[in-house]
């Protein structure tokens, strides 16, 4: 019978029938594996965001307007999306892998075991701290390194 409320114990089925824990050693190794998978989820998300930002950092093919034409210049410059297909495919692939891993972590938490829940949450927090909480959170890729631009 599947649990419908949180419980604490070493006997848990995680994701499928082949991943059952009956000993404390197996249970603790499973919790470590879930913690590492959760941290890896955060790493993949940070990597996907960096790839997406770096792919969009290519300079525009249209030069900036002269100061006299600034009032008539378009607000958005057209981007050349033709050369960005490999980067778009890479970010889509990373998004798919990351989504799949996220859903697997959600299903593991749905075992309603308290240790599994804590391991996933601690892994997500540790991964966020390690890979996504730096000052580059609001990372903006600038094509012109001049501070006055």
From Swiss-Prot:
Molecular function via GO: copper ion transmembrane transporter activity
Keyword line: Copper, Copper transport, Ion transport, Membrane, Transmembrane, Transmembrane helix, Transport
Domain of life: Eukaryota
Chief location: membrane
Annotated membrane topology: Multi-pass membrane protein
Annotated compartments: Membrane
Chain ranges passing through the membrane: 21-41, 104-124
Cellular component terms per the entry's GO annotation: plasma membrane
A Pfam family matched in the record: Ctr
Record family assignment: Belongs to the copper transporter (Ctr) (TC 1.A.56) family. SLC31A subfamily.
Role, per record: Involved in the transport of copper.
UniProt name for this protein: Copper transporter 5.1
Natural source organism: Oryza sativa subsp. japonica
Gene coding for it: COPT5.1
């Amino acid at each position: 019978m599947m649990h419908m409320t949180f419980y604490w114990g070493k006997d848990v089925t995680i994701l499928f029938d082949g991943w059952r824990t009956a000993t404390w050693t197996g249970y603790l190794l499973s919790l470590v594996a879930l913690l590492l998978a959760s941290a890896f989820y955060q790493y993949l998300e940070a990597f996907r965001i960096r790839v997406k930002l770096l792919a969009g950092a290519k300079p525009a093919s249209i030069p900036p307007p002269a100061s006299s034409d600034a009032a008539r210049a378009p607000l958005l410059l057209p981007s050349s999306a033709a050369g960005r297909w490999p980067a778009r495919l890479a970010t889509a692939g990373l998004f798919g892998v990351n989504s799949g891993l996220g859903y697997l972590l959600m299903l593991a938490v749905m075992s309603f075991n308290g240790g599994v829940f804590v391991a996933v949450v601690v892994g997500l927090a540790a991964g966020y701290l390690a890979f996504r909480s730096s000052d580059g959170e609001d990372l903006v890729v600038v094509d012109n390194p001049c501070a006055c631009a």
